[in-house]
Amino acid sequence: MGPFHVESPERVLVLNRMLEEEAAGEFLPVEPRPATEAEIAWIHERGYIDFLKATAGRTSVFLDGDTSTGPRTYETALLAAGGFLNALDAILDGRVRNAIALVRPPGHHAEASQAMGFCFFNNVAIGAEYLVRRRGLRRVLIVDWDLHHGNGTQHAFYSRRDVLYFSTHQVPLYPGTGATRETGDGPGKGYNLNVPLTAGKGDEDLLYVFRKILSPVAAQFKPEFILVSAGFDIGRGDPLGGMLVDREGFGLLTDSLLAIARLSCPGRVALVLEGGYDLPTLKNGVREVLARLGREDPGPLPDPAVSAVTARELEPCFRTFRDSWEL
């Protein structure tokens, strides 16, 4: 996508400038590498990989109504996925405690054989598969707080129990998946948890979901690594959304995940950038996440209050999830 598309290069450029101007020396950079085609093929079909590879050097190829390639899309998508894998290695090898991959294009909408919603390769799904196949982990938790449901990630692991997918997302909204009843299939039944929320939810609403649903589920699942599809389009003022999460809210969500990780997987948390199209909101949200990742001890989390509206919306989630988990 080009400079006038909401998913533009300026998204990562503004983050790079923020790191250079406000956080120089605070964090250890991890150099990206291109993911191999074999790594991409864990999630995506070979024919689709070859098709996307054939777009290299071409000015523009439209893949759906809002997703098109540029001359370097294939190369950049490989670097986004491979950069996330390098971040996972850096954590597991003890070089860093946790990480956030500030990459584009995003990935959680990408299906096995289809680009969707600005996404080409599913970075977080490839990361989870890498942890299982290459690093020998048995339980990986994916938390997706993006505005939109991660249809591609859900479908990648829908029949599996070694990867638990947990999503909060606004409804009704693109892509139309992510109902509470979509809980997995076969051995994966109960390992796909969707929490759809209507517009207007803010810091306390999301923190309540994390504290009252995600945390007890994670305590029972006992993940060995937590991956996060970090969408900053839930931030107040995002042009594609209607959520009201502020800078502090992104920090509290991060603290909540770090608290879960301390109990089950010695702090292993890796975030990968998904959405977020209001540049000031994106920059401020990422800055707060980085600040929380850098703390040795975040301290106790607040006990959030929840509105009657949110409580009613969550009732189907509690009923459905109790078939598989103690809540």
Positions of PLM-derived features:
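N-terminal low-complexity, Ser/Thr- and acidic-residue-enriched intrinsically disordered segments
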Residues: 1-42
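A general "terminal functional-core" signal
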Residues: 4, 51-327
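Low-complexity, intrinsically disordered regions enriched in charged/polar residues
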Residues: 9, 34, 42, 46, ...
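Short glycine-centered helix-capping/turn motifs at secondary-structure transition points
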Residues: 19-25, 47, 94, 135
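Charged, often glycine-rich, active-site loop that binds/positions anionic groups
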Residues: 33-57
